[in-house]
Amino acid sequence: LYWYSAQKKGYSGVAIFSKIKPKHVEYGCGIEKYDFEGRIIRLDFDSCSVMSVYHPSGSSGDDRQAFKMQWLTDFQNYIDDLKKKLPNLILCGDYNICHKPIDIHNPKSNANTSGFLPEEREWMEQFIQSGFIDSFRHFNQEPHQYSWWSYRAGSRGKNLGWRIDYNLVANHL
């Protein structure tokens, strides 16, 4: 078990379970304001690198939405640089973004909700197009496949969810 948590107890963190010992473990991305929140851990193996990532949520207000949008820009730059030396990347985690209308139970009513904002979805599209495959959607095009449900109003039982968790694989793998 390899893990990296936020300095604030109970706030956020990431982990990777592996039976294989990695060649290298990288904690964080080197940007202090994100590393304080335990957002990234990466394990490098002989043939690939696996990253667990936890993107910020913007749902608590404008300040956190701005933080999230800055994170998205910085994360893209970080991954673009990383791909130059570690091209065989597998990025797993909570992106706090529903990529397409199929990934959310009610796209119309959530059109202006953090996690499904047009600018977030556009970022996700461009990020995937920069060299990744959404491994779940590659094999499963069915609607109503979610990874998160609100605790309110029995959302899980009604399958009123959001698909915000992704396993993105370098497209040449």
Predicted region positions:
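Metal-dependent phosphoesterases centered on the DNase I-like endonuclease/exonuclease/phosphatase
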Residues: T73-I164
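Short beta-strand and adjacent tight-turn residues that come in two discontinuous sequence segments
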Residues: W3, R137, V169
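Short, solvent-exposed loop/turn segments at secondary-structure junctions
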Residues: K8-K9, P22, H55-S60, N96-C98, ...
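Surface-exposed cleft-lining segments at the edges of enzyme active sites
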Residues: I31, P56-L72, K108-N112
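Structured beta-strand-rich core segments of catalytic domains in phosphoester-bond hydrolases
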Residues: L1-G58
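Residues forming well-ordered secondary-structure scaffolds
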Residues: F36-G38, F45, A66-Q70, D74
